[in-house]
């Protein structure tokens, strides 16, 4: 019998405006992986979607490098593997494609190295590698997650927030915006006054989400001062998306992660008309309705006749 590990790993959106590097939500776009042992010297990567075209198929592959680094950390040896991949998560668009790949690599190392890491331990490891939990936490656990990574203790603490009863619209531009380029425009420091103000906005946003006060939550999301004022000029379509969304009574329009994808939260009864309007008025972008993934990464082992 041939043993195959199958992974279904969700996309994620980070920040929700003012929750910079600490709040994220899993979405129903996925990286699908099928992994099996092979009797060869080198790993084999097979890609079955356009989103993955151009990715390395050798030792420069990020999943390969990450899985081997984890194996070394726990003093185990991984067999040669064949990894089949299919994805509808666009790369470098602010939808957590790198976090999905990272989580996939951790699950591969954990299973084929028989390391026996719990989900909590996988989160700790993922956040230590990534530097913050905003994408990896919802990717692993699903839902809407707030978290903090302490770089001194190297411990990540997370709390789950009830998933908001709203519809999500993604407006995805045709161009990439790499995280390192998007971070380059951010200031190195904030004044104490500015930090206090943004902290107050973030606190209010979280409380409003918990109480299902989505208008208030959206108002807070759109008052972010941590990153959006510095990044909006990198996304020419942003202001028009926000303007159209407000005309359709959306709760908030924010940058998804480092961008350039634009995330809109809106009432369920308004979402269909809004997404059609966005498709018509901003036709160089792909606008679509998505739902919130509440379970995180799904892993299963299947056995096939050899």
From Swiss-Prot:
GO cellular component terms attached to this protein's record: cytoplasm
UniProt pathway annotation: Amino-acid biosynthesis; L-threonine biosynthesis; L-threonine from L-aspartate: step 4/5
Transmembrane residue ranges: none
Organism: Staphylococcus epidermidis (strain ATCC 35984 / DSM 28319 / BCRC 17069 / CCUG 31568 / BM 3577 / RP62A)
HAMAP family found in the cross-reference section: Homoser_kinase
EC number(s) per entry: 2.7.1.39
Listed name of the protein: Homoserine kinase
GO molecular function: ATP binding; homoserine kinase activity
Biological role: Catalyzes the ATP-dependent phosphorylation of L-homoserine to L-homoserine phosphate.
GO annotation terms (biological process): threonine biosynthetic process
Gene transcribed to yield this protein: thrB
Subcellular location: Cytoplasm
Residues binding ATP: 90-100
Catalytic activity: L-homoserine + ATP = O-phospho-L-homoserine + ADP + H(+)
Keywords of the record: Amino-acid biosynthesis, ATP-binding, Cytoplasm, Kinase, Nucleotide-binding, Threonine biosynthesis, Transferase
Entry similarity comment: Belongs to the GHMP kinase family. Homoserine kinase subfamily.
Family matches, as SUPFAM superfamilies: GHMP Kinase, C-terminal domain, Ribosomal protein S5 domain 2-like
Statement: the UniProt record of this protein carries the keyword Nucleotide-binding: yes
Keyword Kinase on entry: yes
């Amino acid at each position: 019998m041939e043993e195959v590990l199958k992974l279904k790993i969700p996309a994620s959106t980070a920040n929700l405006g003012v929750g910079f590097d600490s709040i994220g939500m899993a979405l129903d776009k996925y990286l699908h992986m099928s992994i099996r042992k092979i009797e060869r010297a080198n790993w084999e990567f097979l890609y079955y979607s356009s989103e993955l075209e151009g990715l390395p198929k050798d030792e420069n592959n990020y999943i390969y490098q990450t899985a081997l680094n984890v194996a070394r950390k726990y003093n185990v040896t991984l067999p040669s593997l064949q990894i089949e991949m299919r994805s509808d998560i666009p790369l470098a668009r602010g939808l957590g494609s790198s976090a999905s790949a990272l989580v996939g690599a951790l699950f591969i190392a954990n299973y084929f190295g028989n390391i026996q890491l719990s989900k909590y331990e996988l989160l700790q490891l993922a956040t230590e590698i990534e530097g913050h939990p905003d994408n990896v936490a919802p990717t692993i656990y699903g839902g809407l997650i707030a978290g903090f990574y302490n770089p001194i203790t190297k411990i990540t603490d997370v709390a789950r927030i009830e998933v908001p009863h709203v519809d999500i619209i993604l407006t995805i531009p045709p161009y990439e915006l790499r995280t390192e380029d998007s971070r380059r425009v951010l200031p190195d420091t904030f004044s104490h006054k500015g930090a206090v103000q943004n902290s107050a906005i973030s606190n209010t946003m979280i409380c409003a989400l918990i109480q299902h006060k989505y208008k208030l939550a959206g108002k807070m999301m759109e008052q972010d001062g941590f990153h959006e004022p510095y990044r909006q000029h990198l996304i020419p379509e942003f202001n028009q998306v926000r303007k159209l969304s407000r005309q359709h009574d959306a709760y908030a329009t924010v940058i998804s992660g480092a961008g350039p994808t634009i995330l809109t939260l809106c009432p369920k009864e308004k979402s269909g008309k809004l997404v059609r309007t966005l498709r018509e008025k901003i036709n160089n972008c792909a606008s679509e309705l998505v739902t919130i993934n509440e379970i995180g990464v799904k892993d299963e082992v299947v056995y096939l006749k050899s």
